[in-house]
Amino acid sequence: MGETQMTHITIDGKEIEVDSSLTILEAAQKADIKIPTLCYLKEVNEIGACKMCVVEVEGKNHLVTSCNTKVAEGMQIHTKSDKVVRSRRQVLNLLLANHDVRCFSCSKSGDCRLQDLSNEYGITKSCYEGDAAKFAPKKENPFLTYYPELCINCQRCVSTCNKVACNGTLHNEKIGTRTLIDAPFGPDWKETDCESCGNCARVCPTGALVAKNRKKYQVGKVEKVLTTCPHCATGCQYYLVVKDNEIVDVEPANGPSNQNLLCVKGRFGSFNFVHSPERLKYPLIKNKETGEFERATWDEALDLIASKFKEIKKQYGSDALAGFACSRSPNEDCYMLQKMVRCAFGTNNVDNCARVCHSATVAGLAMTLGSGAMTNPISDITHDVDVIMLVGSNPEEAHPVIGMQIRQAVERGTRLIVVDPRDIGLSRSADIHLKLKPGTNVAFANGMMNVIINEGLADEEFIRTRTEGFEELKEIVKEYTPEKVARICHIDPDHLREAALMYAKAKKAPIIYCLGVTEHSTGTEGVMSMSNMAMLVGKLGKS
């Protein structure tokens, strides 16, 4: 990498030295100088559409948009000159001309970027008469509502849908003041590819796109609590927004696995149950005479449970008892459960529902690598890689945020190999789709390794210094020619060869697998085969 070129500029009289690759806006942010924006999203929407970020650069005969203008040596920049302020006030006047300003009835009042800027620049009502057409709200989507009259056409939602979530659902229709976001939240929303992830609503600076489960609040009067999504194992982080001890909203955090993204489950299914009227608020004990559950105290409930456990243990022995934990329970809760079962019950009958899904991974990777866990963080396997091999996994449904990041990778040019009997959503973007006969994952992997070895693509240095048992593996896979594997797996042998060459020749090529590999009678062997394939070409842990 070359040395960073530094540039000297002056912003509002403050001399600073910055990386020459930065924009004026980024340079100002590093210097803690505030420049207002409406449409800007870093690396996603740097189009300068709203013109709120304009600044005055000495020597220029016009204002420039700071979000997409690079710094230059000796630049003298003014962010608050009379000319700049007049321009921003004019922008706000034009935006408010076609904007419904009944803020008190808007769910985003108090958390609206347009409202904040209008108050800051003293523009509460436009001096112009708007000419935009009137459109009815689109409310049929169960999670999201679109209010066209509140839209300022900043394009943040469109860019987020197409470049971040990479779902390609939101588009523009019409032009000029009649430009409208084609949001599929009307009666036909089910017929679109919209995943209702809500990432579009997250970036909306007004109340045009809103989540239906979001309750009205003012930003300065709430508490935000960082936590982890309880649904899948991606580990997305978000903030629960709490007002008067009630959760009113959820905001994504820039966590290592989700990077400000959330899926429909994380955004819309993560907190409503907390205050649900259907939740039990106290213990219930069944009345033997009436057969109905009746309210009890905690002491009564715990005494009953403890006495039953003692009774069973005394009559049938410790092994008549067991503890079974939920995979969504925190590690601390699972630890306390097994402690109680082993110490109080006197048995090792402890289990967790995740064992059925993931014991094959723990056993298989522990045997081949010494650790039963993934070798790289999610950011490694979806960023800056050449090929992704997706085996027995449908992340768009099971782990949607990972699915979004894989779509991002494909948009950036990463090649995709899908190995799955099903026509999953990502197979539409795949360079190769191998539709294996279910249960033939080991044969598939052996066939891949057969081609890799015969083509001389094995990483001999990695094998010699980092592995053992290669000669035995080589002898086993020798029989798994593409033609034999094609008969076992019901695939085209040429497609198998093509996939093997694409995978082996790539510099960085992670393998992402899921329950399609593990939930078989040969699940552990399937995991070991995936691991062997990665070691054969020396791609283990590369990022």
Predicted regions mapped to residue ranges:
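Fe-S ferredoxin-like electron-transfer domains
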Residues: K51-C197, R202-T228, K243-E246
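Catalytic alpha/large subunits of respiratory electron-transfer oxidoreductases
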Residues: D100, K215-S543
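Short, surface-exposed charged micro-motifs
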Residues: E15, T169, Q237-Y239
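Short, structural beta-strand-to-alpha-helix junction motif
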Residues: H8, L22-E26, K70, P330
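A basic, amphipathic helix-loop patch mediating RNA/tRNA/ribosome contacts
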Residues: I24-E58
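Eukaryote-biased recognition of intrinsically disordered, low-complexity regulatory segments
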Residues: T4-K14
